[in-house]
Amino acid sequence: MMRFLVLAGYFELTIYLHLSGKLNQYINMHYSYLAYISMVLSFILAVVQLYIWMKQVKTHSHLNGRLAKVTSLALLAIPIVVGLTFPTVSLDSQTVSAKGYHFPLSEGTDQAIQTSEGTTSQYLKPDTSSYFSKTAYEKEMRTAADQYLSQDSIQITNENYMEVMEAIYDYPDEFEDKTVQFTGFVYNDPSHANSQFLFRFGIIHCIADSGVYGLLTKGNTRQYENNTWITAKGKLVNHYHKELKQNLPTLEIESFTKVDKPENPYVYRAF
């Protein structure tokens, strides 16, 4: 009976996340079909377990002892309890501040920082190179970069956000002087009073590999507070950042508009 309840719980959890609109805060929505497959499988297995319990079918178990069985079921029930009872919190500039002002995957940054944190979190630039061979990655990004370089003005949307950002950081010199427009939340650079980053939190596969991606901005005529959402338009230049000890693609802002926070603040990488 307990196995049926646990499996039914996973089925109900997936339905809850879907109907409440919270599923997009846990996984890349391009892979949402996997969640639906797991939901169907959970339902089928729950029905099987209900049948076994009602018919008193003898089954073999590798778990010897009541404590082992209870412990295994309790561990399986933890995700259900967490998913149904814990509040969902959107990542924002407080998350960036909590990690400290350093970007572990930026070129020239001490990699020992990342090792000591035990994290592979990505900052500024999305990096999908680990999912391709070197040749395949270079070909993929070259094709993407050429697509956007051919445009007079690059409109960065929810759909292409991570692809464009990765291309900009891979080919900063080629994108210099290109006009771009995108929406993100403000993160004030604690090292420079008049500098602000414009970020979006992006998910490659699931929330575990999420990172904060965007551009340093210059030329703001108004200083916004952290977590203020704006749409900015301007030209890309390469700016040397002393703290990161590297050139960063930077948006020289020509116009900006304060906007409401999107219903879904996350962006996703499409492959």
Where do the protein language model's features map onto the residues?
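Membrane-embedded alpha-helical segments of integral membrane proteins
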Residues: 3-59, 67-68
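Short nucleic-acid-contacting surface segments enriched for D/E, G, S/T with interspersed K/R
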Residues: 38, 219-232
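Transmembrane alpha-helices and immediately adjacent membrane-cytoplasm interface residues
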Residues: 46-48, 52-102, 106-107, 111-114
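Membrane-interface segments at or immediately adjacent to transmembrane helices
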Residues: 89-172
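OB-fold and OB-like beta-barrel modules that bind single-stranded nucleic acids
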Residues: 180-186, 227-236
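Short aromatic-glycine-enriched beta-strand elements
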Residues: 192-203, 246-250
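Beta-strand/loop nucleic-acid-binding surfaces
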Residues: 209-222
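OB-fold/S1-family single-stranded nucleic acid-binding modules
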Residues: 241-267
